[in-house]
């Protein structure tokens, strides 16, 4: 079971220190022993610990779109990702991996905005940073199988 973390400065003015994010990610080592990933930009930091189950070789996170302005971290599994991937390819999206269910999320958000969420079948918690609009979106599966906690401080 993976784990995701994030820090967002309310005004997006205070830089997130990599050491802050790395400390948070270290607390999740029991949830994902296989790898960790972090990214910081514009008052936002996203991180994750991964238990590699799907796409063992190329499923590293955070996952970015081609231009790097949309970033995703997620925990879970998207059962219908191949179907969504085929539809996105018809819209011109290119994938680095044919096997990453999480990579589908960044392209689906890019194509449909938050309207992509009802298309997802599976269990997931995800966070998306959209650098184009400077907005953060967090979501989880309909039944809450993958929990998502957040707070304002």
Tell me what each language-model feature is.
Residues 1-153:
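N-terminus-centric sequence/structural signature that marks the extreme N-terminus
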């Amino acid at each position: 079971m993976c784990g995701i973390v994030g820090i967002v400065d309310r005004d997006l003015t205070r830089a997130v220190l990599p050491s802050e994010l790395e400390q948070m990610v270290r607390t999740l080592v029991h949830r994902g022993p296989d790898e960790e990933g972090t990214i910081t930009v514009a008052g936002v930091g996203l991180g994750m610990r991964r238990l590699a189950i799907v796409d063992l070789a190329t499923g590293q996170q955070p996952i970015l779109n081609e231009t790097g302005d949309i970033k995703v971290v997620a925990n879970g599994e998207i059962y219908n990702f191949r179907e969504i991937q085929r539809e996105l390819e018809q819209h011109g999206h290119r994938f680095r991996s044919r096997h990453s269910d999480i990579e589908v999320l960044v392209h689906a958000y890019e194509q449909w905005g938050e309207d992509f969420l009802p298309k997802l079948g599976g269990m997931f918690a995800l966070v998306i940073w959209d650098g184009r609009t400077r907005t953060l979106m967090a979501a989880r599966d309909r039944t809450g199988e993958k929990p998502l906690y957040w707070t304002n401080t």
